[in-house]
Amino acid sequence: MNIHEYQGKEILKQYGVKVPEGRVAFTVEEAVEAAKELGTQVNVVKAQIHAGGRGKAGGVKVAKNLDEVRTYASEILGKVLVTHQTGPEGKEVKRLLIEQGCDIKKEYYVGVVVDRATGSVVMMASEEGGMDIEEVAANNPEKIFKEVVDPVTGLNGFQARRLAYAINIPKELINKAAKFMMSLYQAFVDKDASIAEINPLVVTGDGEVMALDAKLNFDSNALYRHPDIVALRDLDEEDEKEIEASKFDLSYIALDGNIGCMVNGAGLAMATMDIVKFYGGDPANFLDVGGGATEEKVTEAFKIILRDEKVKGIFVNIFGGIMKCDVIANGVVNAAKQIKLDKPLVVRLEGTNVDLGKKILNESGLNIVAAESMADGAEKIVSLVK
């Protein structure tokens, strides 16, 4: 689950992480009032969307007086920002963060992530702050420094100081920077975050170490422990299909392709997307119906896939263990009949009750293409949508 920058900063403040004073605004008048309350000569008007790259897209402006605050707020509110993370459709700006300007002496990057390669939490830091960290990693990997964190001891002081030295934090601010990093790590752990990214972390002219931007994402599986985080959810920022899928406990992520995929099991779902790509297709989604899906759940999953107008065909790939193939078959047939399916449908079934499942599909009267293997199914659906 993602939250807005201003919400992330409020959480970090609770852990002693220093951030600029700011106010959220939903209208131009609220933006001007917020700037008045802050009482500084320079304010920053920042679009609040769940995506990076806002500055390059015109979503971050420095205002030197109240008239400029009004002008920039008018320009940004309601604007559709298109960044490298939003996709070509962009995101409409419905709220702003009005923040005190600060005297930036140097920008850095600090982030806490889950590293799949080591199976550990890793704190990363770089002197190349304010930039796309993926770009830095690709072009100048030697400029990114990492510390693997032992989950028992947590981030140690010496590790934080080592990172601060590595990225050339001024010597007199090393301890401040180390404290900042340790507070960031504690927030990451306490809130079950999946990423906590500060880009940029800045050193100011008056010797402060401050988070100028903050990105916090949270593990959806742990949200039951954090009703305070759930309350921060902004449904306007989420894909409607993903919201609908969550109501039925379906794991759905919209992608940019045209082949809908319905699979049971996250590993098989990823393998299915890979093999569709291998045969020249583009998956339209990741969709895991889980091991204990009911007919209703399968039917809803099918409907959600077909809400995507880009979908030109569907590949159902099921290995029945806990999930029974006849349940999947009934769900597919019911959904196809309800929505009067007129797009290619390839189904591969294996496992529990596979013969019964195939019988249900064969007797449905629907134009369903059977696949004998995952590769066979991927090849068939790719050829059918071309």
From Swiss-Prot:
Pathways per UniProt? Carbohydrate metabolism; tricarboxylic acid cycle; succinate from succinyl-CoA (ligase route): step 1/1
Alphabetical list of SUPFAM superfamilies matching this protein: Glutathione synthetase ATP-binding domain-like, Succinyl-CoA synthetase domains
Q: What is this protein called?
A: Succinate--CoA ligase [ADP-forming] subunit beta
The organism named in the record is Brevibacillus brevis (strain 47 / JCM 6285 / NBRC 100599)
Q: How does it assemble?
A: Heterotetramer of two alpha and two beta subunits.
The question of whether Flavoprotein is a record keyword is answered with no
- Catalytic reaction equation(s): succinate + ATP + CoA = succinyl-CoA + ADP + phosphate; GTP + succinate + CoA = succinyl-CoA + GDP + phosphate
Which of this chain's residues are annotated to bind Mg(2+)?
A: 199, 213
For activity, the cofactor(s) needed are: Mg(2+)
Q: Where does substrate bind?
A: 264, 321-323
| Membership in a protein family | Belongs to the succinate/malate CoA ligase beta subunit family.
